[in-house]
A protein has these predicted regions:
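C-terminal binding/interaction regions
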Residues: 2-19, 37, 68-121
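Small-residue (primarily alanine) positions within well-ordered alpha-helices
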Residues: 10, 28-29, 58, 62
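Short beta-strand scaffold segments in enzyme catalytic cores
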Residues: 22-32
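A generic structural signal for short beta-strands and their flanking turns/coil linkers
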Residues: 24-26, 39, 71
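Glycine/charged-rich beta-loop-alpha catalytic/anionic-binding loops adjacent to active sites
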Residues: 34-45, 67-68
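Compact, glycine-rich, soluble single-domain proteins
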Residues: 42-56
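Short, charged low-complexity linear segments at domain edges
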Residues: 52-71
Length: 121
């Protein structure tokens, strides 16, 4: 699957996001090493800190389906990932992270997005 095809899946997922407060709908699509695509969306809450980003939603679904760090090949997101999500993407060792930035698709590695990540090593 190309990065563009994965991004198109994220765009389709974004239409299902729950964003009644900001009206900012975000979708994410994770490509697993065995070729499955797992989608996630942002889910807002009236108590703003309790909302969930699309990347977190997709990664949580992947974990619930039995995937672990190293099992995921790529992710596409309809927005630039926040700092917390960059840490999560690094944790799962995403080789390719594609997102829209200022109207263009950008592809980076998780290491490029967060070069000095925190970990236990």
């Amino acid at each position: 699957m190309t990065d563009q095809e994965l991004y198109d899946r994220a765009v389709a997922a974004a239409k299902r996001a729950y964003a009644p407060y900001s009206n900012y709908f975000v979708g994410a699509a994770v490509l697993t090493m065995d070729g499955h695509v797992i989608e996630g969306v942002n889910v807002e809450n009236a108590a703003y800190p309790l909302g969930v980003c699309a990347e977190t939603s997709a990664l949580s679904r992947a974990v619930a389906e039995g995937y672990r760090p190293g099992d995921l090949e790529a992710i596409a997101i309809t927005a630039s990932p926040c700092g917390g999500c960059r840490q999560r993407l690094h944790e799962f060792r995403l080789g390719r992270v594609t997102y829209e930035h200022r109207g263009e698709l950008v592809t980076r590695t998780a290491d490029e997005l967060l070069p000095d990540t925190w970990d236990f090593e």
